[in-house]
Swiss-Prot record:
GO biological process terms held by the UniProt record: chaperone-mediated protein folding
UniProt organism field: Xenopus tropicalis (Western clawed frog)
Pfam family, one: DnaJ
Keyword Cytoplasm belongs to the record: yes
Gene: dnajb6
Record localization: Cytoplasm, Perinuclear region; Nucleus
Classification via SUPFAM superfamilies: Chaperone J-domain
Identification of the protein by name: DnaJ homolog subfamily B member 6
All copies of domain J, residue ranges: 3-69
Assembly, per entry: Homooligomer.
Length: 242
C-alpha cells in the first residue's frame, strides 16, 4: 500500500512547509508532460504525489490518515469511526487540479515573467529575493530544447531573477489566463499565457506563446503592440502610430 510520507520523502513529523516543498519538487519532476518517454510511470507517480499532498497538507485529513491510514479517508476501514468526518469516503481530486491550485491557477508550462512570483504566497518570502539567481537553463529547456529566457532564468526556482525586469511596483494586476496542450511527441506542444496589468494608468497586456519549439512574446499598451520578441530576440516593429 502507498505510504504518503514515503511518497513525498518526508518524515512523519514534517512541517506544512516541508510538505509543500516536497510536493513542488516531485510534481514538477513527475509531471507527464515532462516525461513523454516514460508517461505511464510519470502519470502513476504524479497521481501518488498529488494524493499524498492533498492528504498531508490538510491538518484534518492528515490526522485521520495518521490514525487510520488511507482506509480512514476512503471509508474502507474496519467499522465506523465516530470522529472520522470521511466515514463514507473521501474523494480525491484530479492530480491536474491539485497541481493547478498549488501554482495559484498558473500553468508553469506557460509561465508569465511579468506577473508576481507565484511562490511568494506559498513560501512567504516576498521582498527577500531581489537579486538572487541560479545558473543553468530554463526549465522549459528540458522540453526538447525550447528556448530559454536567458542564462539565469529558471521559472521554478524560488529565487529566480529575470533580465526582463518588471513593470515596477504593484501596478494593479487585472487578470491572468493560460492554457497548454500537447501529445506525447514534442512536435505538437503549444502553450499560451496572457496577463493584463494597469501600469501608470495604461493597460499593459503581455501574451506569451510557445509552439513547436518557438517562443513569441507580445506586449501591448492600450491595445497597441509595443514590443515583439521571438526566441529571445526583440523584433523591429513598423508602427504606423501617429
Amino acid at each position: 500500500m502507498v505510504e504518503y510520507y514515503d511518497v513525498l520523502g518526508v518524515q512523519r513529523n514534517a512541517s506544512p512547509e516541508d510538505i509543500k516543498k516536497a510536493y513542488r519538487k516531485l510534481a514538477l519532476k513527475w509531471h507527464p508532460d515532462k516525461n513523454p518517454d516514460n508517461k505511464d510511470e510519470a502519470e502513476r507517480r504524479f497521481k501518488e504525489v498529488a494524493e499524498a499532498y492533498e492528504v498531508l497538507s490538510d491538518s484534518k485529513k492528515r490526522d485521520i490518515y495518521d490514525k487510520y491510514g488511507k482506509e480512514g479517508l476512503t471509508g474502507g476501514g474496519g467499522g465506523s469511526h465516530f470522529d472520522n468526518p470521511y466515514e463514507f469516503g473521501f474523494t480525491f481530486r484530479s492530480p491536474d487540479d491539485v497541481f493547478r491550485d498549488f501554482f495559484g491557477g498558473r500553468d508553469p508550462f506557460s509561465f508569465d515573467l511579468f506577473a508576481d512570483d507565484p511562490f511568494d504566497d506559498f513560501f512567504g518570502r516576498r521582498g527577500h529575493r531581489a537579486n538572487r539567481s541560479r545558473p543553468g537553463g530554463s526549465f522549459l529547456s528540458t522540453f526538447g530544447g525550447f528556448p530559454a529566457f536567458g542564462p539565469t532564468f529558471s521559472p521554478f526556482d524560488s529565487g529566480f531573477s529575470s533580465s526582463f525586469g518588471s513593470f515596477g511596483g504593484h501596478g494593479g494586476f487585472s487578470s491572468f489566463s493560460s492554457s497548454s496542450f500537447g501529445g506525447s511527441g514534442m512536435g505538437n506542444f503549444r502553450s499560451v499565457s496572457t496577463s493584463t496589468k494597469v501600469v501608470n494608468g495604461r493597460r499593459v497586456t503581455t501574451k506569451r506563446i510557445v509552439e513547436n519549439g518557438q517562443e513569441r512574446i507580445e506586449v501591448e499598451e492600450d491595445g497597441q503592440l509595443k514590443s515583439l520578441t521571438i526566441n529571445g530576440k526583440e523584433q523591429l516593429l513598423r508602427l504606423d502610430n501617429k
